[in-house]
Amino acid sequence: MGTPDFAVGTLKELIDNQYDVVAVVTQPDKPKGRSKELVFSPVKEEAVKNNIQVLQPERARDEAFVEELRKYNADVFVVVAFGQLLPKSIIDMPRLGCINVHASLLPKYRGASPIQWAVIDGCEYSGVTTMKMDEGLDTGDILLVDKVKLDKKETGGSLFDRLSIVGA
């Protein structure tokens, strides 16, 4: 489950390492520009290139979506910047649980925009935390932390690029 470029590296790694990625969940296509042409999320683009089923719920809590997801009988869900909170019914669904890859050194900068806040606040370090998800917002048991030192000239864009590689 993921949406922006930050999540694409993780999806590619899963595919390249021969994991059986049977479906991808991403945000619905969004209209862009004056023509309001629908644009795929970066994660959907990668999934389509790899012939992976794509699910795009308006709301992750919708019962029809939850039931559709249940049909996959997944061992694990990997969540990277999906953009919606998952209900307990989804978190508890896979046999091995849900793993979240978050772009901060948790517990600092839970939720949205952690990369930008690390730069705005002038942090000396940032990183990527991999955790087992629970019902809270980025509050699950921490499994792995990858720490990186920020450059004095670090921008949100440069840190995004660095952390997306680390997170993959």
Residue ranges and their predicted role:
Residues 20, 51-53, 97:
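Conserved beta-strand segments of alpha/beta enzyme cores
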Residues 1-34:
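N-terminal Rossmann-like dinucleotide-binding module
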Residues 23, 56, 143-144:
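A structural microfeature
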